[in-house]
Regions:
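Conserved alpha/beta-hydrolase catalytic His-Asp/Glu region
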Residues: 24, 141, 156-221
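Conserved HGGG/HGGXW glycine-rich cap/lid loop of the alpha/beta-hydrolase fold
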Residues: 18, 22-73
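Gly/Ala-rich beta-loop-alpha elbow adjacent to hydrolase catalytic centers
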Residues: 106, 110, 114
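Flexible "cap/lid" loop of the alpha/beta hydrolase fold
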Residues: 115-119, 126-162
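Catalytic active-site module of serine/aspartate enzymes centered on a nucleophile-bearing elbow/loop
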Residues: 251-283
Length: 283
């Protein structure tokens, strides 16, 4: 298994753009005049989170996937990254790539960002997909686990510790190919990345988290038709959390992808791609 066969048979471009002063690495595929869909990764992640989804979506959409501020190979300004900073970066990115309006897909932290963006900028969001999203969970044990396994992969970076971090995302560890481990190891061993990860992980501290959390009241202001995707083995929050999102968002429905953990777009690509594309197309 490899990270790259998924990307070998279609056309795409890896680019960088200045998004509000943040040098932002992103992937683009599909027709520029097609409706845009933006894929937003989770904590410590990068755009390759969505390698298994790009070309199926590019048949219908202008696909954009980016390394969020502080993440991947994008710029890493030295300050703690709270949700408002990610929301501002996403808004600047949409401006920079000329996408006035887009579907948003957010995985984990990306779902937290996407939900808050839909609350703050409703006119710019078409349909919204929250994939095992953060933002409601305030379980200190989970927060500590995220912090510990992530910082260990950075402070003691090796192929083994990085693999352990990635395997935490999936139900079957065989889903993690060696070259994905090598890519993330390259990201985690960039000069200064330990400091960047400390800034990323500020949301795992309760005081910071509580001033950023989503609430039923704030989710009730989302006007986009929404799909909440959950799994039966998610390590960050139970299915009940997905149900809370659906109950709070006025026009939302729930889909559960079984046999998956925290990366259903990767673990169950065929089921995910069909579900996701059908939803975005209104089928």
């Amino acid at each position: 298994m490899s990270l790259w066969p998924e990307m070998a048979t279609g056309e795409f471009a890896l680019k960088t753009v200045n998004a509000g002063g943040v040098r932002t690495r992103y992937l683009e595929a599909g027709r520029r005049d097609a409706p845009a869909v933006v894929f937003i990764h989770g904590t410590g992640g990068h755009l390759e989170t969505f390698n298994r989804n790009v070309f199926e979506h590019a048949e219908h959409f202008r696909v954009l996937a980016l390394d969020m501020v502080g993440h991947g190979f994008s710029s890493k300004p030295d300050h703690p990254y709270e949700i408002r900073h990610y929301v501002r970066h996403l808004d600047d990115f949409l401006d920079a790539v000329g996408a006035d309006r887009a579907h948003l897909h957010g995985e984990s932290l990306g779902g937290w960002i996407a939900a808050q963006y839909a609350i703050d900028h409703p006119a710019r969001v078409d349909r919204l997909v929250l994939n095992t999203a953060g933002g409601l969970n305030t379980d200190e044990a989970v927060m500590k686990r995220v912090y510990d396994v992530t910082m260990n992969a950075v402070r003691n970076a090796s192929l083994e510790t990085v693999r352990k971090r990635l395997e935490w995302l999936v139900h079957d560890p065989r889903e993690i190919p060696d070259d994905l481990v090598e890519l993330r190891h390259a990201i985690y061993t960039q000069p200064g990345f330990e400091r960047a990860m400390e800034n990323i992980l500020c949301l795992q501290f309760m005081g910071v988290r509580m001033r950023n959390v989503l609430t039923e009241e704030s989710l009730g202001r989302i006007r986009s038709k929404s799909l909440v995707i959950w799994t039966d083995h998610d390590p960050t929050a139970p299915l009940a959390t997905g149900e809370r999102f659906v109950k709070a968002i006025p026009d939302a429905r729930l889909a559960v992808l079984e046999g998956c953990a925290h990366w259903p777009q990767w673990e169950a690509k065929e089921r995910f791609n069909k579900l996701h594309i059908d939803f975005l197309l209104g089928r």
